[in-house]
Amino acid sequence: MALPDIAETRKLSDTEINEQISGTRRELFDLRFQQATSRLENPHRFRHARVKLAQLLTVQQERERSAAPAN
């Protein structure tokens, strides 16, 4: 499974980005819980979820900065 592509993330609407952020945070929480209880089958999913979350937050931040008036 390849890492997520930021170009796909940039195509999402603001609402979809917010939904994906909360979903990815929940996924990371679940992965940590599985790791703590020794039920984690795919440890590489940590990296994918972290990269996806970073990309989502980056795009969200870019949009907030472009919408804010420049001083």
Curated annotation (Swiss-Prot):
Query: What organism is listed for this UniProt entry?
Result: Synechococcus sp. (strain RCC307)
Any one of the GO BP annotations: translation
UniProt entry keywords in alphabetical sequence? Ribonucleoprotein, Ribosomal protein
GO MF, any single term = structural constituent of ribosome
Q: Which CDD domains match?
A: Ribosomal_L29_HIP (cd00427)
Q: What protein does this entry describe? A: Large ribosomal subunit protein uL29
Database matches in Pfam families: Ribosomal_L29
Name the NCBIfam families for this protein: L29
* Family recorded in the similarity comment: Belongs to the universal ribosomal protein uL29 family.
Superkingdom of this protein's organism: Bacteria
Alphabetical list of Gene3D superfamilies matching this protein: 1.10.287.310
> Which segments cross the bilayer?
none
CC terms in the record's Gene Ontology section: cytosolic large ribosomal subunit
KW Ribonucleoprotein (keyword) present: yes
